[in-house]
Structures are given as C-alpha cells and as structure tokens.
C-alpha cells in the first residue's frame, strides 16, 4: 500500500537520524526521494563479453553530495562556501513525486515540462515501430516546468541514466528569464545557445520554437476541430484542460488508419528512444562514484 510505503520511508529516515545505518533494496518510487540523491545507489547489470566469455557485469552508481555542491559553487562563484547539504536538499525537496522518482528505475528518461507531454508522448510512441516506452524501460518524467529540468537532468545524468530533454523554447516571450532558461538547457546539452529558427532536434535534446500546441498545429490540419470535440466531450472551458485536450487529440490521431503521428513528434520520439549516455554534465571535478563488479 502507498501509505504503508511512505510510513516505512519515514521510519527508515528516523532510524538513520539516530545514528544507525539503514540499507535496503527497492523497486518502489515511493521509497526514494530525489532530495536525498546522495543516499541512492543505482544498480545496473548487463551481459558483456569479458575475456571471451559472456559475463554478467554489475555497476553501482552513486552521486556524492560534495560533487553537487562543488558544481553549484563553480557555476555560481558568489555561493562559494555558502552551500550546505541542507540547502542543496531544499533545492530538490519540491521534486519529491512518485512519478518523477520513477526515473531512478528507468533505463532511459524523457524529461518534459508538464502533463501535456507526459500524457501524449507515450500514445504517439505506441504508434511507431519499436518505440513503445514501457517494454524498453523508458519513463517520461514531467518536471513541473522548465525551471526544474536542469536540476533533475543533473541528478539522473550523473547516475548514468540516458536522458532526453524536450521543452518549449518560448521564442518571442518578453520574459528574459524564460528565454535564458531555454538557452541554459541547450548549453547543458552541449548545444548552441542561439535562438532556433524552427523545431530544434538533436541527439539528447529538442525544443519547439514557441510551444507544443502552436508548433504542432500546422502538422495536424484538424487540430481546432479535435480540440473543440475534446472540450465538448470532457466538459472543458476554452482556457482549461490543455493536457487532457492534447491526450484526446493524440488518441484520435492514432486511431486513424493509418495512425497519424505528427512528423515533428515522430522525429523527437525516435531520437529519444535511441538516446545514449554521453558524459558528466557537472562542472565539478569527477571522483569515484561507480563500482564495477563482474560475476
């Protein structure tokens, strides 16, 4: 039961705060907390050829708190010596969410801004060859907005989980902070910070020039008609239910013969399914955070 799992998590935390070490293994997203990323050890096992023999090789990935603090202070020199473990946890405390925590157990992650993408992408993926997410261990993680995407990317990436970032660039937005965040995400992925002129798709990141809805509208000729049907069937007002409308449209499109997946989303999904882990994204100096065990 979810309530029991949350209770167990609190009990474990209380025991640990009393000075005893608690070690447990889990596949439950309710028993991990992104704010305590440094206490999570991610185990990965693969079959590899070692000395000519097929061997099970296990790796244990962990992200030390010191590396995250060093990274933050390197990026913001004015914080040098001021970042404590408690304040670092505060930066991530809002992110505790079983759906987001699911990323710790994924083989690959697609980081998205909100529910529109979380609801719709899996539906479109099901209509593409070899792209269904669940059988491949791929999770779509909504970040609660563009502002938190870089933080979650750093955690998941440093645990060696391949991540694909999808966001709205919001070109034309008068809020400089929003545009700066878009540029920051592109830089984080090693891409140019120049404003894209159209849909931008790379090996580990993609962004719509303005927004999901407006950019895809040209690829869905009857988008307005479908949106109207969704509002009528779901009882939504004109300015509400954006994620539900997007999901409705996705379902209607793939029910057609043949299924209709907007070309932009087809390209993005195929890139996301193929994403591979590249390198650390931290500015901090790397240290020992991985152990190899051959069995």
Walk through the language-model features, giving the residues of each.
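Switch/communication elements of ASCE P-loop NTPase nucleotide-binding domains
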Residues: 1-86, 90-98, 274, 278, ...
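Acidic, Mg2+-coordinating catalytic modules of nucleic-acid enzymes
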Residues: 73-111, 115-295
């Amino acid at each position: 039961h979810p309530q029991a799992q949350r209770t167990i998590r609190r009990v474990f935390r209380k025991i640990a705060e009393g000075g005893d070490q608690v070690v447990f293994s889990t596949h439950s997203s309710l028993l991990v907390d992104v704010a305590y990323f440094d206490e999570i050890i991610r185990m990965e096992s693969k079959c590899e050829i070692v000395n000519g023999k097929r061997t099970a090789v296990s790796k244990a990935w962990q992200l030390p708190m010191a590396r995250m603090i060093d990274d933050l202070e390197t990026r913001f020199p004015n914080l040098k010596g001021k970042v404590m473990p408690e304040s670092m946890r505060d930066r991530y405390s809002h992110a505790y969410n079983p759906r987001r925590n699911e990323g710790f157990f994924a083989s690959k992650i697609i980081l998205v801004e909100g529910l529109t993408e979380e609801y719709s992408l899996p539906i479109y993926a099901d209509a593409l060859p070899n792209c269904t997410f669940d059988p491949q261990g791929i999770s779509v993680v909504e970040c609660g907005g563009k502002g938190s995407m870089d933080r979650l990317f750093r955690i998941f990436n440093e645990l060696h989980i391949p991540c694909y970032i999808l966001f709205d660039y919001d070109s034309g937005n008068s809020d400089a902070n929003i545009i700066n965040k878009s540029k920051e995400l592109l830089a984080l992925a090693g891409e140019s910070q120049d404003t894209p002129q159209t849909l931008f798709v790379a090996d580990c990141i993609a962004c719509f020039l303005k927004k999901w809805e407006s950019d895809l509208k040209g690829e869905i000729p009857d988008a307005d008609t479908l949106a109207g049907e969704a509002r009528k069937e779901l009882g939504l007002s004109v300015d509400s239910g954006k994620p539900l409308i997007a999901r409705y449209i996705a379902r209607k499109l793939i029910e057609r013969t043949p299924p209709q997946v907007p070309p932009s989303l087809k390209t993005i999904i195929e890139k996301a399914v193929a994403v591979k882990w590249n390198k650390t994204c931290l500015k901090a100096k790397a240290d020992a955070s991985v152990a190899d065990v051959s069995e």
